[in-house]
């Protein structure tokens, strides 16, 4: 459970930083302020739709849930890498992948934990949710520090690295 909490911490750190810094980064890559707000709205809509679709797939298709989460985290990491390129088009594609996959995994993850630890759902999800909350709080702080000292591209690559780490950790832990 502690390893799963670390996975959620890394994933939430990267994803929550995206929500915090995406508009200022959109301006930095060439969008005006109004368009940057629309970019955030698009990302949020992608995240909402993706969460609903992922939930329906998890309910109906009965996939390996942790593998599904790992795929979502992996796709999210690609999105974060694209955000780092600093071009308006790749930024938009990265945003769609980042929100659509990289921040849509928590519901499926909680479902997987509840299914895997059916005899102690409350304890198991309490531990893994602790990772989410620690990561969600620490991610924007880390992103801001990296962006301040090394630039926004380095901060997005750091988030990409956290997502990749979460993906690899989850693939190892799920065995």
Which residues are covered by each model-predicted region?
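Multi-pass alpha-helical transporter architecture, strongest
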Residues: 158-175
């Amino acid at each position: 459970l502690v390893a799963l909490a670390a996975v959620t911490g890394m994933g939430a750190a990267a994803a929550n930083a995206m929500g915090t810094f995406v508009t200022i980064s959109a301006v930095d890559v060439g969008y005006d302020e109004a368009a940057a707000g629309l970019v955030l709205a698009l990302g949020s809509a992608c995240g909402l739709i993706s969460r609903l679709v992922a939930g329906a797939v998890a309910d109906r298709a009965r996939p390996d849930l942790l593998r599904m989460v790992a795929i979502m985290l992996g796709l999210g990491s690609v999105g974060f890498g694209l955000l780092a390129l600093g071009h308006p088009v790749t930024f938009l594609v990265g945003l769609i992948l980042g929100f659509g996959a990289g921040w849509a995994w928590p519901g499926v993850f909680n479902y997987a934990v509840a299914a895997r630890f059916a005899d102690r759902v409350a304890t198991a999800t309490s531990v893994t949710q602790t990772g989410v909350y620690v990561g969600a709080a620490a991610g924007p702080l880390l992103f801001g520090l990296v962006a301040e000292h090394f630039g926004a591209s380095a901060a997005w690559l750091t988030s990409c690295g956290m997502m990749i780490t979460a993906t690899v950790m989850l693939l190892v832990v799920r065995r």
